[in-house]
């Protein structure tokens, strides 16, 4: 009798635990995902509280201390204008994370909207939107971003817009394929049969069941967006002086690589660690939400 009650309780517990709970349990078991989450959390914390605790001002120049190696006073050394590299990296974290998160949020919203419309309504709407995505994906993302910034003009804001635009097709095609699968489910046909309007079907059934791949793709896309922002900054098409954006810091320090490698190495390490963190976290989310893709 006791064994039957125990089995019944186990079955009831499994029924209560939804897919989000299962995904979270799987995510916590992944060491690489936890490491990635820890790295991301560290840089987010640095971006929030770092500017209040750094020892030097980001634009505080002292030419008598230019190109100083790492020391007790300047942990990461100084750049060609005598500015503290550590302080600028800390302030740059908020810039890079803001650009990455904002660009991905914009591209996810726009791309998801277009993907849902294309996948659900099909026909000429699907053809037009899909062809636009194909044309955009025919170009390397960084090349397309450079073209957009060249039209809008070099600035951090325009770089953010360019990065958002070039990432729209990846979200759009992902959601479109998801919607094509979902709209053939029986509960969608049942909703149509009882007279439910398309807008309600999209909002109540299609959209909630399409969010899982968006979350995974969004996490991975943040890493790509940070790299693209750094690349645009390095090329002089993103952040402008004296903004301490990591890519801009690399560009300013490249002329002094042999004499002061620390001015270029430390911003590069910051970019690398942030990208690795988001990639590991994204891989963990993908494995948690879709265990079939783990191998």
Feature names for model-found ranges:
Residues 1-112, 116, 123-124, 138, ...:
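Gly/Trp-centered helix-boundary motif
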Residues 210-213, 277:
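Conserved ATP-binding N-box helix of the HATPase_c
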Residues 43, 116, 145-150, 159, ...:
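Transmembrane alpha-helix boundary and packing residues in multipass membrane permease domains
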Residues 75, 85, 109-111, 116-182, ...:
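Generic hydrophobic transmembrane alpha-helix motif, especially the helices
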Residues 187-194, 202:
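Helix-loop-helix units of permease transmembrane domains in multi-pass membrane transporters
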Residues 148-151, 163, 178-179, 228-270:
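Glycine-rich helix-loop "coupling/hinge" segments at transmembrane-helix boundaries
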């Amino acid at each position: 009798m006791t064994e039957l009650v125990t089995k019944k309780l186990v079955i009831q517990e499994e029924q209560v635990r939804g897919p989000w709970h299962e995904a979270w349990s799987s995510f916590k078991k992944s060491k690489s995902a936890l490491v990635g989450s820890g790295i991301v959390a560290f840089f987010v914390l640095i971006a929030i509280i770092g500017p209040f605790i750094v020892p030097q001002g980001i634009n505080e120049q002292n030419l008598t201390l230019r190109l100083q190696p790492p020391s007790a006073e300047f942990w990461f050394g100084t750049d060609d204008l005598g500015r503290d590299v550590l302080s600028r990296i800390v302030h740059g974290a908020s810039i890079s994370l803001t650009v990455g998160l904002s660009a991905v949020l914009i591209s996810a919203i726009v791309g998801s909207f277009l993907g849902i419309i294309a996948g659900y309504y099909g026909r000429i709407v699907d053809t037009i939107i899909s062809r636009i995505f194909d044309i955009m994906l025919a170009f390397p993302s960084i090349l397309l971003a450079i073209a957009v910034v060249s039209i809008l003009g070099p600035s951090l804001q325009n770089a953010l817009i360019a990065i958002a635009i070039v990432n729209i097709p990846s979200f759009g095609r992902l959601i479109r394929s998801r919607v094509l699968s979902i709209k053939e489910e029986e509960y969608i046909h049942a909703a149509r049969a009882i007279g439910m309007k398309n807008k309600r079907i999209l909002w109540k059934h299609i959209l909630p069941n399409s969010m899982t791949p968006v979350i995974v793709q969004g996490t991975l896309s943040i890493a790509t967006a940070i790299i693209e922002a750094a690349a645009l900054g390095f090329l002089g098409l993103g952040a402008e002086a004296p903004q301490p954006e990591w890519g801009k810091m690399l560009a300013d320090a490249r002329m002094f690589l042999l004499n002061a490698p620390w001015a270029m190495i430390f911003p590069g390490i910051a970019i690398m660690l942030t990208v690795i963190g988001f990639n590991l976290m994204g891989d963990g989310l993908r494995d948690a939400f879709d265990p079939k893709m783990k191998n």
